[in-house]
Amino acid sequence: MPVKNLFDLAGEVALVTGASSGLGARFARVLAGHGAKVVCVARRRDRLEALVASIAAEGGTAMAAEADVTAPASMAAAFDAAQQKFGTVTILVNNAGIARQARLLEQTDAMWREVMDANLNAVYSVAQMGAQRMVAANVPGSIVNIASILGFGVSKSLSAYAVAKAGVVQLTRAMALELAGRQIRVNAIAPGYFVTEINADFLATEKGAAMAREIPMRRFGAEGDLDGALLLLASKAGAFITGASLVVDGGQILGLRGG
């Protein structure tokens, strides 16, 4: 295959969770921009519809599917809607997640369960659902789970998040081992700190600037910095890659506790 065609996603159907904003919205745009039909999944329908309109204006093809990743029935409905409109999902980007900060001694059981449900249990459930449908349709596929550098190290006040993301890393490896024979690749992307609409104001403060200076490349991740990693793992360019966790963090993990 010519090198120029390695990242071509024409004929693929991609489903992206947490697509209403931030990294998820960017992932949806990138996949659509390279030819995939994209199913944008999140809870905020108004944001999803705006994203779909934006993708269409750029020449891409997308649909909105309102769903909660922690509610299996609603995710099954999203997969059904994707199947009906575009066909079997062949690229799954498990991006949805939450972060809750609390020191260990003050953290509540409810907070722990909330973080685990959104960041680990839902990743397992959605990935299993996607894989089952790929196998039933007898098609190859790619599952990309969004982990974090905190899956490899730790940070104060984020114990639940770090444990969940470490679980995503191991889940990715376990799924890759079991699904390789079905021609389904499973990989993870582990981002460092990225600027999003949620944290942009804080990261622009002096405290945020001090945090950036601790990163070897002296900046936070910006829009577009994950494009290459996503396309590599989703496309034919990564046809022989499975079970990997690709760290994209400007070297931040090098100074992380336990990293």
Predicted regions and their residues:
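Short C-terminal tail/terminal secondary-structure segment
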Residues: 2-5, 153, 231, 242-259
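Conserved glycine-rich cofactor-binding loop
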Residues: 13, 20-21
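Conserved glycine-rich Rossmann-like NAD(P)H-binding loop of the short-chain dehydrogenase/reductase
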Residues: 34-50
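Substrate-binding pocket helix/loop in short-chain dehydrogenase/reductase
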Residues: 103-104, 111-116, 199, 211
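Active-site helix of classical SDR
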Residues: 127, 164, 172
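Alpha-helical segment proximal to the catalytic Tyr-Lys
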Residues: 132, 177-181, 239
